[in-house]
Amino acid sequence: MQPALKQGYAVPCFNVFGYEDALAVVKAAEARNASVILAVNLDMTLFMPLEHIIGMLKPLAQSATVPVCLHLDHNYDIPTVIKAIDAGFTSVMYDGSQLPIAENIAGVKQVVEHANNML
């Protein structure tokens, strides 16, 4: 994603709900020789174990001929967010917006500390 930042262009992000969606997005990105972000939303994590999701999407991303970012989108469950970091998601979004501000900040801090320990 660094080339996009340096060269000032956007990278599209698509919510995917299964392998077929993800494959179609990656194939379209490859046809355009464009980077892409595959976003996994909360609904997908409620119906499929995170380990299965990463097992399905990570090989697809790694075998793509263009850069593919795996993003866990708007997830409010800290253990799930941490599990996603450990499993190899490129980015995560912890969403504590429904919590009191102090709890939200504490949750963000916990996720950031864990992510920084992975560097």
Label for each model-derived stretch:
Residues 1-12:
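N-terminal amphipathic alpha-helix/helix-capping segment at the start of soluble metabolic enzymes
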Residues 7-8, 32, 118:
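Structured helix-beta-strand junction loops
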Residues 11-15, 36-40, 68-74, 92-94:
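Hydrophobic faces of well-ordered beta-strands that scaffold small-molecule active sites
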Residues 19-64:
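Glycine-rich, positively charged N-terminal anion/phosphate-binding segment
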Residues 20-23, 46-54, 74-83, 97-119:
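Active-site-adjacent beta->alpha loops and helix N-cap segments on the catalytic face
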Residues 32-34, 86-92:
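Glycine-enriched alpha-helix->loop->beta-strand junction motifs that scaffold or abut catalytic
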Residues 64-71, 118-119:
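Short beta-strand/loop segments at the ligand-binding rim of alpha/beta enzyme cores
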